[in-house]
Structures are given as structure tokens and as C-alpha cells.
Curated annotation (Swiss-Prot):
Species of provenance: Vibrio vulnificus (strain CMCP6)
Enzyme Commission number, as recorded: 5.4.2.12
Cofactor note: Binds 2 manganese ions per subunit.
Protein name: 2,3-bisphosphoglycerate-independent phosphoglycerate mutase
Residues binding Mn(2+) 2: 13, 63, 442-443
Length: 510
């Protein structure tokens, strides 16, 4: 076996590009290696945030999303954007599980219940999605549409539900049918720590209209809760029912659509609608057609509107199918990112894939050791390059991100300087064996250590672009306008390998 000349991808976590040098630890640190690479090697900037990585417009990237997009070689839409996009494209309105549940209820003259976290928070749900579901039920002929509102106050200000409730009261008035039928704080409906006494409050409200209070409008019910000193999150079970209106308790044959997309706080209340349940004694158990917006747990036997999108032929899987060898290497802090997330949420190693883990230092905060374990990581990385064993090596250096998160500017500069020395050794090793190297980042962080708006410490990620640098013997010229999902196709192209059809990213080399 002749020694392999590896293609390496080095991900400098949290290493973004910002023109302004104020509080920019990357621009102000002494970085002779990176300076020389940018002066002499093919390089460009690529996008690592917002819709380019499947997040909402303008939202900063993060390590999980970044590595998923890099490894997938296509934009991987997060649930929020996937569902928003489906509504705009008209696909949501044709989703089989939703159509079937609504149409079955309409045919039998039964009710359609829509429930979920009623807020624009975008963490567990989005009220725009709930609005689309109400409109869809009305368009498909449902006469009885009951909206059960779980109130937020955690991902939104503590008393901010009124605007959302007013919006839906207005919508029902416009539709001429349906109503907000109940209110309860997420503290009850969305518990995730097996506090079944709380969940039972929500279950009894939904299935029996059993409530501490009844008001004739949602806004009035909320105002009364505020009078009692309850913020949105803690609003007690409240039935919304005017004089002469019938009860909105769930009945046999009704459709129930749960519009939360994040699983962790949706599981428990959903399990109360499954026959096999031991959390508490259910006074009633209506036989409803229940639809989960996404899969809340693999063992919940209910319909799913948006099943998990499995990622076929990610970079790692594709290399494995070509009989190639690959190494994933990082410190503890980012080990899951170069393995699990890079492989599209697959925990097991592919054939030909090896993993090396370097322990991150045991310090309270990384500003106390900004170089982290970069010396040991680099020794292992250089040895791997020179070993001749690997076709591809994926490596993540966590320093710029983990030290950036501390908000300590001097430490961030030291972290960048330690990184620069490490990159220098990796570049030398690659040149020595005649390999190829791409240097990039998954998102920004250390390039902005002070918030320019407030003047306060900035510890979060940024939505700025990240560098892409090539080192190797090919005459490479980069295209402009690239994004993280273009890296896998570009690497396959540099390695002379075929690109699978599932990878919709573009090759960034002209």
C-alpha cells in the first residue's frame, strides 16, 4: 500500500471575518501564519448563517447546524425554517397526515382541535404555523375549530401573550367560525421532568374542559390571569366559552393537531393521548385522531406531519461507500460536532472511519487556558497527516469559539495566537506529504468581543462570513457566494471523486 496523501479539512470553530478591527480578537492577534496564507493562497469568504444554513433569515449560525451543513453537502433546514418554507410553498396545506385528520373530522361532522405554544418565540413553535393550520382547517370545511393556547413567557417576555391572542380572536371573527377554546401556561402543558400533576391540569382542560376559570374571550381570560399575578408561563387552566357556546372538550372522532415542532417539551402531553400510559389516572380517554407536527419520540405511535428528514449520502457515508479511509479528530468540546453532527445525526462510525479524541483542559472557564489542548491536538493531527493511513481528515479546533464565549478579550487574542501556531504546523505537514488542505470555520464569534450597539461584552456567535483557504498543489480559484453546504462537494471534487445526487451544494472551485 502506497502512503495516502490526505485531503484535510480544518474547522476553526468560531473564527469569523469582520472588517472592523475594534474588539476583533482575530484581526488584532499576531497571526503570521494566517496572514501569509491569506496573502499567498487561494481564499474567499463563505456564508455560515441564516437561510444559507437552514436557519431563519439573519439568525447567527451555531456549531451543530454548521457541522450538519458541512457534512451533508446540502442546506439542512431546521424544523422552524422547514415548516415555514412548506407553508410558503403550499406543501404544508397538502401534508398527508394533516389532510387526513381534518378531512376525516369534517366528514363525520367532528371538531378539529389545534393546540400548541402560542407565541412568536420560534423555539418550540411559531404562531405563524398555528395560523396556517387554523386557515387550512377552515378551508377544508371544518365548522368546529377549537384552538387550545399554551402560553409562553419564557422564550418571549413574561407578559406578552395578548397580541397573539388578539390576532387569533380577529382571525376567528374574520372566518366566521371557530374560537380560542382554552388557555394554560406552558408550565403545565409543556413539562418535561415527569411532573405529571402539572400535565394532568392541561390534559383535563383539553379533554373535559375542566378549568379553574371561565371567560368569554381569550383576551379577558389573560387579563384576569395577570390580575391574579400569573405571568404567561403560569396561567392556570382557563376555559374560553361565551354564553350559549358548546363545550370544546375533545370527543371521540375529533382531530387533534399539536403544532409544536421541538420534541422535548411536547412528549409528555402527547403521551397522555396514547392508550398505554401510566403517568396519572385519566378520567376520560377520547379516541381522537392525533397528529404530531414532528416526531416527538420514536416510540409514540401517532401520525407525524413532518417525519424526520434522514440525510442520505453525507460526506462521511459517501467516502465510506467509495472505500476511502477517514479520520475525525477534535477536543472533547467539539468531538460530537466532527462525528455525530458531521454525519447527519448518525452516532455509529462508517466503515473506514476512525475517531481520535483529545481531552479538553479541566478548567472552570477557558479564558484561564486559552490555548486549550491545541498542542496535543496538533501533535496528533500532524502524526495522522504523516501516517499515510487516511484519505481524508476532518479536524476541529475549538479555541476561537470556546474562549470567545467567555467574553474575555485578552484571552481570545491568546487563543487566536495559539491557533495560528497550530495551523502553521498542520500546513507544513500537508506540504511535506503532498496533501491538500482546506481551512474554514463553522460560524463566527471571536471577531466580535464587544457589542457595537450596547458597548457590553459580546459572548454570542455572529452572523458574519467565515474564511475558506486552500493549501495544496492544485491551481485553485474560488467562486464567490459560497456557503458551508458547498464544502463537501468541493472536497469531493478536489479528491477527484464523484459527487452524490443528494449533495445539492456547489463546487466552489472554478
Amino acid at each position: 500500500m502506497s502512503a495516502k496523501k490526505p485531503l484535510a479539512l480544518v474547522i476553526l470553530d468560531g473564527y469569523g471575518y469582520r472588517e472592523d478591527t475594534a474588539s476583533n480578537a482575530i484581526a488584532n492577534a499576531k497571526t503570521p501564519v494566517m496572514d501569509a496564507l491569506i496573502a499567498n493562497q487561494p481564499n474567499t469568504l463563505i456564508s455560515a448563517s441564516g437561510m444559507d444554513v437552514g436557519l431563519p433569515d439573519g439568525q447567527m449560525g451555531n456549531s451543530e447546524v454548521g457541522h450538519t451543513n458541512i457534512g451533508a453537502g446540502r442546506v439542512v433546514y431546521q424544523d422552524l425554517t422547514r415548516i415555514t418554507k412548506s407553508i410558503l410553498d403550499g406543501e404544508f396545506q397538502q401534508t398527508a397526515a394533516l389532510v387526513e385528520a381534518i378531512d376525516t373530522a369534517v366528514k363525520a361532522e367532528k371538531a378539529v382541535h389545534i393546540m400548541g405554544l402560542m407565541s412568536p418565540g420560534g423555539v418550540h413553535s411559531h404562531e405563524d404555523h398555528i395560523l396556517a393550520a387554523v386557515e387550512m382547517a377552515a378551508e377544508r370545511g371544518a365548522e368546529k375549530i377549537y384552538l387550545h393556547c399554551f402560553l409562553d413567557g419564557r422564550d418571549t417576555p413574561p407578559r406578552s401573550a395578548e397580541g397573539s391572542l388578539q390576532r387569533f380572536q380577529d382571525l376567528f371573527a374574520k372566518l366566521g367560525k371557530g374560537r380560542v377554546a382554552s388557555l394554560v401556561g406552558r408550565y403545565y402543558a409543556m413539562d418535561r421532568d415527569n411532573n405529571w400533576d402539572r400535565v394532568q391540569v392541561a390534559y383535563d382542560l383539553l379533554t373535559q374542559a375542566k378549568a379553574d376559570f371561565t371567560y368569554d374571550s381569550a383576551v379577558a381570560g389573560l387579563a384576569a390571569a395577570y390580575e391574579r399575578g400569573e405571568n404567561d408561563e403560569f396561567v392556570k387552566a382557563t376555559e374560553i366559552k361565551a354564553e350559549g357556546q358548546e363545550s370544546a372538550a375533545m370527543q371521540d372522532g375529533d382531530a387533534v393537531i399539536f403544532m409544536n415542532y421541538r420534541a422535548d417539551r411536547a412528549r409528555q402531553i402527547t403521551r397522555t393521548f396514547v392508550a398505554d400510559f401510566a403517568g396519572f389516572e385519566r378520567a376520560v380517554f377520547p379516541a381522537v385522531n392525533f397528529v404530531m407536527l414532528t416526531q416527538y419520540a420514536a416510540d409514540i405511535p401517532l401520525a407525524i406531519a413532518f417525519p424526520p428528514a434522514s440525510l442520505e449520502n453525507t460526506y462521511g457515508e459517501w467516502l465510506s461507500k467509495q472505500g476511502q479511509t477517514q479520520l475525525r479528530i477534535s477536543e472533547t468540546e467539539k468531538y460530537a460536532h466532527v462525528t455525530f453532527f458531521f454525519n447527519g445525526g448518525v452516532e455509529t462510525e462508517f466503515a473506514g472511519e476512525e475517531r481520535q479524541l483529545v481531552a479538553s483542559p479541566k478548567v472552570a472557564t477557558y479564558d484561564l487556558q486559552p490555548e486549550m489542548s491545541s498542542t496535543e491536538l496538533t501533535e496528533k493531527m500532524v502524526a495522522a497527516i504523516k501516517s499515510g493511513k487516511y484519505d481524508t481528515i476532518i479536524c476541529n479546533y475549538p479555541n476561537a469559539d470556546m474562549v470567545g464565549h467567555t467574553g474575555v478579550y485578552e484571552a481570545a487574542e491568546k487563543a487566536i495566537e495559539a491557533l495560528d501556531a497550530s495551523v502553521g504546523q498542520v500546513v507544513e505537514a500537508i506540504k511535506e506529504v503532498g496533501g491538500q488542505l482546506l481551512i474554514t470555520a463553522d460560524h463566527g464569534n471571536a471577531e466580535m468581543m464587544v457589542d457595537p450597539e450596547t458597548g457590553g461584552i459580546h459572548t454570542a456567535h455572529t452572523s458574519l462570513p467565515v474564511p475558506l483557504i486552500y493549501v495544496g498543489d492544485k491551481a485553485v480559484e474560488f467562486k464567490e457566494g459560497g456557503k458551508l453546504s458547498d464544502l463537501a462537494p468541493t472536497m469531493l471534487s478536489l479528491a477527484g471523486l464523484e459527487i452524490p445526487a443528494e449533495m445539492t451544494g456547489q463546487v466552489l472551485v472554478k
